[in-house]
């Protein structure tokens, strides 16, 4: 699973996801992509599950680019522990995704397989997404 090798701080504030994506909103590498339509925190496990669904359906043909990275730690207190006595330990890693952000890009497969594969990947994510394709040049 994806997580940073080294971070400046162990724990992070919850924060809010405001606005729309300005960077990472267009296809940069592949011919087809999956674009987020709502703000959401996507965990490293969800990204990995979507990536596996994507590569399995493509039968390892073509190329996959993951355009988001889970760099925000989410802390959690153990079960049945009273409130107080500090913030919990880092439990998982999430990526803050804004609407309009391209999550996955693929290339080297035809339109039908790309659409099916990205639909399967979208089912693994907790977010509304849209299939995008590069205009034929």
Swiss-Prot record:
Gene Ontology terms describing biological process: translation
* Transmembrane intervals: none
Pfam families to which the protein is assigned, alphabetical: Ribosomal_L16
Q: GO: which molecular function terms?
A: rRNA binding; structural constituent of ribosome; tRNA binding
Which InterPro entries does this chain map to?
A: Ribosomal_uL16, Ribosomal_uL16_bact-type, Ribosomal_uL16_CS, Ribosomal_uL16_dom, Ribosomal_uL16_sf
Alphabetical list of PROSITE patterns matching this protein = RIBOSOMAL_L16_1, RIBOSOMAL_L16_2
Arranged from A to Z, the UniProt key words for this protein are: Ribonucleoprotein, Ribosomal protein, RNA-binding, rRNA-binding, tRNA-binding
Q: Gene Ontology cellular component?
A: cytosolic large ribosomal subunit
Q: Which CDD domains match?
A: Ribosomal_L16_L10e
The protein's job, in short, is:
Binds 23S rRNA and is also seen to make contacts with the A and possibly P site tRNAs.
- Which NCBIfam families does this entry report, sorted A to Z? rplP_bact (TIGR01164)
Q: Could you describe the subunit structure of this protein? A: Part of the 50S ribosomal subunit.
Family membership? Belongs to the universal ribosomal protein uL16 family.
Query: What name has this protein been given in UniProt?
Result: Large ribosomal subunit protein uL16
Q: Which organism is it from?
A: Rhodopseudomonas palustris (strain BisA53)
């Amino acid at each position: 699973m994806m997580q940073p090798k080294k971070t400046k701080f162990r724990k992070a504030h919850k924060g809010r996801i405001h606005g729309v994506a300005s960077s990472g909103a267009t296809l940069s590498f592949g011919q087809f992509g999956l674009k987020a339509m709502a703000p959401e925190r996507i965990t490293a496990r969800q990204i990995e599950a979507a990536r596996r669904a994507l590569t399995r359906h493509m039968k390892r043909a073509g190329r996959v680019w993951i355009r988001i990275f889970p760099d925000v730690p989410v802390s959690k207190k153990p079960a049945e522990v009273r409130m107080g006595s500090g913030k919990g330990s880092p439990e998982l890693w999430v990526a803050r995704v804004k609407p309009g952000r391209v999550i996955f890009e693929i290339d080297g497969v035809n339109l039908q397989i790309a659409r099916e594969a990205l639909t399967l990947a979208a089912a693994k994510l907790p977010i509304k997404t849209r299939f995008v394709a590069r205009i034929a040049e």
